[in-house]
Structure formats: C-alpha cells, structure tokens
Amino acid sequence: MGRRSTSSTKSGKFMNPTDQARKEARKRELKKNKKQRMMVRAAVLKMKDPKQIIRDMEKLDEMEFNPVQQPQLNEKVLKDKRKKLRETFERILRLYEKENPDIYKELRKLEVEYEQKRAQLSQYFDAVKNAQHVEVESIPLPDMPHAPSNILIQDIPLPGAQPPSILKKTSAYGPPTRAVSILPLLGHGVPRLPPGRKPPGPPPGPPPPQVLQMYGRKVGFALDLPPRRRDEDMLYSPELAQRGHDDDMSSTSEDDGYPEDMDQDKHDDSTEDSDTDRSDAESDGDEFGHRDDSERDNTEEKKSGLSVRFADMPGKSRKKKKNMKELTPLQAMMLRMAGQEIPEEGREVEEFSEEEDDDDSEDSEAEKPSQKQHKEDSHADGSSAASSQQQAPPQAVPPSQIQAPPMPGPPPLGPPPAPPLRPPGPPTGLPPGPPPGAPPFLRPPGMPGIRGPLPRLLPPGPPPGRPPGPPPGPPPGLPPGPPPRGPPPRLPPPAPPGIPPPRPGMMRPPLVPPLGPAPPGLFPPAPLPNPGVLSAPPSLIQRPKADDASAATIEKKATATISAKPQITNPKAEVTRFVPTALRVRRENKGATAVPQRRSEEDSAVPVAKAAPRSGPSVPVSVQTKDDVYEAFMKEMEGLL
C-alpha cells in the first residue's frame, strides 16, 4: 500500500491548505506514537523472565500428559494458554537476537531442552493409554514345552481332592484293591501314574445320578439305582414329564366343567333372587355383588380356551344382566328428564346410589309402596318435570311475574330466587315452575318423586329480582337505580291469563327521571319528551325573520316539536354557572339586578342552542359574529358589576 499525498483526499480531491497542514501534523503524531509503543513493548518483554515462561509451559504439559489424573482445564484452554506463552517466548527471542546474541543462545538451549522433555512426556502418556486399551486375551503367549515326566501329579494339591486320613494307615505291602480305571477316558496329554501309586479318589459324597448313568452307558454295565434315586430321575426324563403333563391337562379339562356348572347355577340363583327381592336396598347391594362375580366368571370362561360350552346352556340371562348393568345413574336421570320410562333395574341403581349420597334427605324413600305404584309416580313426575321445563324457560319470564313454590326446607344449591311481593291482579296463565336461576332438573326436596344425584354445579348467583325482604322502595318490577322523585310509579296492569307477560327489556316504567342536570332545589314540573336534546329552540335569538324560518324548518324536519322555552326557576344559580369563578359576585340588592340577570341568562343560553344540532337532527342556526358575542358579554358585565 503506497503512501498517500497530503495535498489530496482519499478520493483524489484537492484539499484546503488548512486541512493539508492538519493532516501532516497528524501523520507525524502517529509516527511518534508508534515509536513510543514499540519502546513500551520492548520494555515489557525485557521485564518478563523467559525461564518462568518455560516453567509455565512445563506445568501445562504435565497437566495435559498426566495418565493418572484427568486434566483440570479443558483441552481448548490448554492449547490457548500454551500458544500465548509460546508467542511471548518467541518475541523475547527476537528481541534478544537483535540486542544481545549471548542471551539469545542460552534461551535457544532452554527451548530445545523443553521440547525434549515434552516429547518424552507425550511418548509415556501414549504408551500408558495404549496399554489401557489393549485386551489381555489378544496378547500372544510364548509356546510352552511339554511338562517333564519326573514331576508327580499327586504332589500337587488338587482343589477337590480329599486329604489322606490320619487315623487309618494303609500298608503299601497289603493286597492291592481293585479299582475301576477310567484313565482311557481322560485326555491323552496327561502323563500316567508311576507303578504302585493310587490315583486321587473321588470327591466326598455320592456321585449324581446323571454322571452314573452316563458312565454306565459308556463303560457298558448297568448300574442299579436305589428306588428313591429312580423316582427322582423320572423327574428329569423329558418323555415321562411330557406324558404326565398330558395327563394333567386332560384331567384339568375334564374338571373344568364342574366349576362352570357351579358358576352357572350360582348365576341362575342370583337371577331369581334379584327378581324376587327388588324392593329392598340391601338386596340390591348383594345383587350387584353376585352380578360382578358372574361377569368376572364369564370373562374368565371366554379367555380360557379349555372350557367346553354345551348347547343346552342358557345364555340369555347373562345378556339380560349385562344390559341391566349398563344402565348408569346418569342415563336413568336423562331418561327421566326426557319423560321416558326407566327400566326397573336402572331406577333401583339410581335410588341406591342416591341414598348413599343424600344423608340429610327425608325418610320417605325407606317406606316405599308397591313396585308398580312407585313406577307410576316416577313416570308422572318425570313428565311433569319435562313439561314444566318446556313451558317455563328461564329467559322468557321476568322474575316479578313468576313465583317459586314455597320451600319447606333448605333448597339444594342456595336460597330460592323468589321475590316476596306478588303484583296484584288475576293469576297469570303459566303454572309456577322451577325458579329461574336453578337448572331444570333440580327440584325442591319437598316435592315427591325420584331425586337424581346432585350434579356438581357452581352455586347460582344472586336472584334476578330484589334481595329478599321488602325494603322501602320500588316494587320488584323496576330495575335498581336512583330513587325517583315525585309520586311513586304504579305497576303496569297484569296481563290477561292467555297472553305471556312481556320481557323485562320491553317493559318501561311510566315515569323516568330526566337525564339532564336538574336544578339544585326543585324538580321540573313536566319531564322532557326527548331527553337527548339539551336546549331550547333557537327562537331565543331576537331576530324575527330568521327565527320564524328556523322554527318552521324545525317543525318540518324534526319528528318531535320542541315547544318549551327554558324555565329558569333559580336565575342566580343558572347565571353563575356560565360566569368565570373570579367574577362570581353576590349582591344584596336583588331588585336592581333581576332584569339584567334575566337578560344575561338569555344571552348565555345561546352556546347551548348552538351545541344542540350536533346531538339532535340538523337545525339551521344563524351564526353570530364576534361583535354580537362581545356586546352580549359587555351587557353581562354591566349587569354584574
């Protein structure tokens, strides 16, 4: 990279003489700084001890090439440290090569010695690691010469040999005992015993029968086993074991019919018992126990392939019981809600589970009449519940028109949402159904019929009407709100019996308080027919032609005619609302200020009249100029001051 000229920029533009001088001065400064930096680096390198650097590198090598202990630092960290130390050592070598060659030669010797030590460490480490990986079995052994014949095998103690007895001494000169020799059966490499020596005896204890049989077949003579041994040996014979197993299988397959018949008899007995004892709850529990046992037996008979099924076995009772078992309390409750007839078995299941759930229910269920009457009651009750559910949906009837039946005890899930007051008039056409807040399948505990198990529901919220207890205030039909001033409103006349009462959203109370800000002390005598319009018609502005035209257009365009002028009942309060707070002055002389206040009130009502067309229909209003507004303001000030 060549040097750039100081008279031009990087792109070749001619530079200002001032910039040229600044650039040259900066170049000189950088050159001087570079010399200083080189001197600082040389001084730092001279301060470092090269022998210490070599020792640090040796420590790193010992840590890395240690076959016993894993290195504490990571392999990458060790490489980085050695690289930095080596670079520093080479810089010191270059420095001393220029300045002091004698020190340079000494440092070279140190480096060569370090490299030799490092190579030795690495070689030892590799040898140990390779020895750890090599398997011992793969190492070839040298060929061993044959054992000399003068070595006696008897002198070598065998692990299973019995030591010679101390008590009984056998004479070498006595008659030799005959022994069955089994030496030819052994390997050929074993040297023979010298004459006159006995081979070591067998291990203590009788030999196992398998060994005796094997050697009896090989040598050629039969061995007579004791009867106990022969019986034990039969256990090891595969043919006999197979034959015995077949006999056992045939006997078990013949005997399998007996438990099956017993189970069938027990199954039929349980069927008859359950048919006769249906009205008793305890017999229900026993019946379920029998049924579970019979179901378990049936599944075991299906699984085992050894059972024999005959053609004359009755199979319908099992199917019937299975169908009876499958009717759960939930299905029975849904059948009852739909108004259908519940099978006897399912209903008793439901009653049994419910008797366990309801601890504080009445004892009327214990004294049950005959089965037929109970069935008719439950059927009629289910149909009445379904009809009341169809006739009285909770949303279609306001709570003020429907009265819940009187509750003799605490209801299942909370207080009954029944307003205490009933509006006067003829009774409505709807029968009193369940309360609007409760789900349709919940009945008060006083009503007859089968109670289903209580579902896990959230407790209902507050009742739709007023809280119980008639506080002084509006009757239950009105929505809660600020108490209306004036005469108390009358209830709407109740609907004739044939027509359902209107929804709560459609009923409007006859007298609603006005929405606008009322004067502090009084109530306006007539309510506004359109509370959305907040001002009077623009006929307040004293311009006769424009006022007549605008009033005519109002009557043509708007559906509701605005005919009331602002009735100022408290002029002082109304005027001071439009005045800045700093100018609110109260005078004792009311007679002198009454007329200007009335006039200023009429002027101050103009901004409200201008704001009116935004909320209501579009009304053409004559625009006031700044002079008119200023003149009205000055008149207002004159009236106040």
From Swiss-Prot:
Any one GO molecular-function label of the UniProt entry: protein phosphatase regulator activity
Pfam families assigned: Wbp11
UniProt keywords, alphabetically: Acetylation, Coiled coil, Cytoplasm, Isopeptide bond, Methylation, mRNA processing, mRNA splicing, Nucleus, Phosphoprotein, rRNA processing, Ubl conjugation
Ranges where the record places region Required for nuclear import: 1-45
Location of Phosphotyrosine modifications: 236
Bias (Low complexity): 381-404
Positions carrying Omega-N-methylarginine: 192
GO cellular component annotations of the record: cytoplasm; nuclear speck; nucleus
Chain segments carrying region Interaction with PP1: 217-221, 306-310
Disulphide bridges: none
Compositionally biased tracts (Acidic residues): 253-263, 351-365
Sites bearing Phosphoserine, chain numbering: 181, 237, 279, 283, 353, 361, 364, 600
Residue stretches in coiled coil: 75-133
Biased composition (Pro residues): 192-210, 405-447, 456-504, 510-530
UniProt feature, compositional bias: Polar residues: 1-11
Function text: Activates pre-mRNA splicing. May inhibit PP1 phosphatase activity.
PANTHER family found in the cross-reference section: WW DOMAIN-BINDING PROTEIN 11
Protein name stated in the entry: WW domain-binding protein 11
